[in-house]
Structure formats: structure tokens, C-alpha cells
A protein has these predicted regions:
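Active-site catalytic motif of lipid deacylating hydrolases and related acyltransferases
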Residues: 32-146, 316-321, 325-355
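Bacterial Sec signal peptide processing site at the extreme N-terminus
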Residues: 17-37
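Hydrophobic/aromatic beta-strand patches that form the interior of the parallel beta-sheet core
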Residues: 82, 113-115, 209, 239-243, ...
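Positively charged n-region of N-terminal signal peptides that target proteins for export
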Residues: 1-4
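C-terminal catalytic-base region of ester-bond hydrolases, centering on the histidine
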Residues: 220-357
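Short, highly selective alpha-helical patches that border small-molecule cofactor pockets
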Residues: 95-99, 158, 254
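Serine-dependent carboxylesterase/thioesterase catalytic core
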Residues: 109, 127-253
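Bacterial N-terminal signal peptides
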Residues: 7-17
Length: 357
């Protein structure tokens, strides 16, 4: 047993050494731009016509077509997506690829870049307190609850942030500014929909996608505190989808087989577990690398018309390299749903505030 544990940790150490550390610098905005970004980011930076608002309110969140994205939602704001990459440097570009993939499908680039230095992704080595704090900042500024996409150890951090927001591991949390990349001296926000004060603890994320969280990365010291709670999803998220792969040594419990990879709700959160097609050793890191799909029309057609499944498999008739397409399609379906839900929620609240004034 000791030999097996030592061998596993040695393999992980070698992988981290060869792959490089996945920590990236979160560069704050230049001093001269801080005030401008502070004053312009969020609700004050956009307006929609009454006609477009009516079309958005008429959308069915469960069936958002490519035409809806390209026309009805074009130019509309979107919930910020916080992407958290794993612990190896090579996965950074793959999460950036996934960010570009969503942009190419029609999701606003501004909603995937942090306003400080323009980062598309943050490291799993950042504190979960920071992640929870920027969730609060984005919600207060934008009026839409953010989404989180976590890959590998990024999935651990996503769940840690949920535990913090649920009050399971903290009584108070600071708001964090992604413009300055530092905490603010407050633990409350003004709820943009009600105008009332609300502590950071108790806020919700709209959607989380957690890909390849578990496996041998559980033995890393920075994840020991999640050994027995990784699969427990608290009420601080509306919808949570866990993705796992067969033969995934790095991110799959029992090599990605069976219910040990399944997340479960501790309360009212909607939780799905999706088994992706079995791959090889490299599939764990390569799955999010999907911007190549943007130049494959048959693949895009399948992605845009995807019907959710707990074991999705793309048709073999689609040409080209398809690794990861099922992950991309399922996430895009959920992202579209929560984009519409959050935007409709914001529009209705603004109408209510006008009528109540």
C-alpha cells in the first residue's frame, strides 16, 4: 500500500515537473484604467431596446437555437464565466481554447475575460476565497449570477468555492475585485435586483461544469481537505454537471469507472453526472481543447442541436478529430440555458423596479 502511494505521488511529481506549474499571474489593470473600469463595468455599460427585451423574454431556456444566439441574444450581456484550469502549465492553453470555442459559438468574449489583465482562465492554485469573492463582485456589477467551468484540480476549487458560499467552511467572505485582483474591505454586496444588502455568504452560482475532478490528484496536499467532500454539492449553485472519463488516471476515481465519480446534491441543487467516451491517458488534458470545432460545420451542427444525455456519443459520420465534442456540446447547452435564465431574470427585475419607482 505504501509503495503504491509513493509511486502515485512520484508519478504526479514527475508530471508536474515535466508539464510545468499551472500558476499564472493575475495582472491587475493599469493604474490609469482602474477608475474607468470601475465606473463602466456591468449594468451601466449596456442597454437593450424594448423590442429586443421582448424577444429575449419570449425565449425558451430549454431550447435556445443557434439563430436565437446569433440574432435575439446578439449584443446582449451575459453572465461571467469563471474558468479554472488544472495544475499543469500545458492545460492553460486548452482552457483558453475552450473559452474561444464558446466565443465562436456566440458567447460574448467580454463575459469570459477578466477586466483587469484580460485573463481567460485562472489557476487551481488560487484560493477558493478569491473565487467566491469574484462571484460576488460579478453578480453585483452585472446582475447575473456567474458560471464556473473547472477542469481537473479546477473542479476541486469550484466545489470549495461552493462550500464557502454555502457557509459550510466560512462565516464571512470578502468581495474580491478582478480589476485590482485583491480583496475589498467589505463582506456584503448590494443585490442589483433588489437594492438590498446581502452578505457574500449565501450567494449562488448559476451553473458549474466540473471536468475530471478526482483520481490521483486527490493525494496532492492542496486537495487533502476535499478528500471526503469533493462529490457533495451544496445549495450555492442552481445546476451542477460533473463530467468523467473512463481510463482517466489523473481525474477519475477508480480510473473513471462507476458511481464513485458521481456528484450528489446535499439539498436542492440540480446535479447531473455525465460519462464521456473512454479515451487514453492524454484525454484528461485534451478534452477542453475545442476551438478546432469552429471550422468543422458538421460538428457545429451537432453541437448546436445537441440533446442532453448522461452518456453522449457523437455520430461517427462527423469528420475530423472529435475528442471532447460531447463535453463541449453539453456545456454549451447548459451555458445557453443559464444565459437566457439570468438575462430574463435581470430584465424582469429591472421592469419591476421601474414600475415600483
Amino acid at each position: 500500500m505504501k509503495t503504491a502511494i509513493f509511486s502515485t505521488m512520484a508519478a504526479l511529481a514527475a508530471l508536474l515537473t515535466l508539464g510545468g506549474c499551472g500558476k499564472i499571474d493575475l495582472v491587475p489593470a493599469e493604474t490609469g484604467r482602474v477608475a474607468q473600469l470601475d465606473s463602466s463595468h456591468g449594468l451601466r455599460s449596456w442597454s437593450l431596446s424594448g423590442a429586443q427585451e421582448s424577444r429575449i423574454l419570449a425565449l425558451n431556456p430549454e431550447h435556445v437555437t443557434d439563430a436565437d444566439v446569433r440574432h435575439t441574444l446578439a449584443g446582449a450581456p451575459a453572465p461571467h464565466i469563471i474558468t479554472i484550469h488544472g495544475g499543469i502549465a500545458t492545460v492553460i492553453k486548452r482552457l483558453e481554447s475552450f473559452s474561444r470555442f464558446l466565443n465562436g459559438l456566440g458567447y460574448p468574449e467580454q463575459a469570459m475575460r477578466h477586466p483587469g489583465g484580460g485573463n481567460r482562465t485562472i489557476s487551481c492554485y488560487e484560493d477558493a476565497e478569491m473565487i467566491a469573492g469574484i462571484v460576488a463582485w460579478y453578480y453585483e456589477r452585472e446582475g447575473m449570477r456567474p458560471m464556473i467551468i473547472g477542469h481537473s484540480q479546477g473542479s476541486f476549487q469550484a466545489v470549495k468555492a461552493l462550500q464557502l458560499l454555502a457557509g459550510q467552511t466560512a462565516d464571512h467572505l470578502s468581495v474580491w475585485s478582478p480589476i485590482r485582483w485583491r480583496p475589498e474591505d467589505r463582506t456584503e454586496i448590494t443585490d442589483p435586483l433588489t437594492g438590498k444588502k446581502h452578505p457574500v455568504v449565501g450567494l449562488k452560482v448559476s451553473y458549474i461544469a466540473a471536468l475530471g475532478g478526482g483520481g490521483v490528484t486527490r493525494v496532492l496536499p492542496n486537495q487533502w481537505d476535499m478528500m471526503f467532500s469533493l462529490r457533495s454539492v451544496p445549495d450555492s449553485v442552481e445546476e451542477f454537471t460533473g463530467f468523467y472519463l473512463g481510463l482517466d488516471v489523473l481525474g477519475g476515481d477508480m480510473l473513471g469507472w462507476g458511481s464513485t465519480n458521481h456528484y450528489h446534491a446535499t439539498g436542492s441543487a440540480r446535479v447531473r453526472n455525465v460519462k464521456l467516451p473512454t479515451g487514453g491517458f492524454l484525454t484528461h488534458g485534451h478534452t477542453p481543447d475545442l476551438d478546432r470545432m469552429l471550422s468543422n460545420p458538421p460538428a457545429l451542427a451537432w453541437i448546436n442541436n445537441y440533446a442532453p444525455s448522461l452518456q453522449p456519443v457523437a455520430p461517427k459520420e462527423i469528420p475530423g478529430k472529435l475528442e471532447g465534442i460531447e463535453f463541449g456540446a453539453d456545456v454549451w447547452k447548459s451555458v445557453k440555458r443559464h444565459w437566457v435564465i439570468e438575462l430574463q431574470r435581470l430584465i424582469r427585475a429591472r421592469h419591476g423596479n421601474r414600475h415600483g419607482a
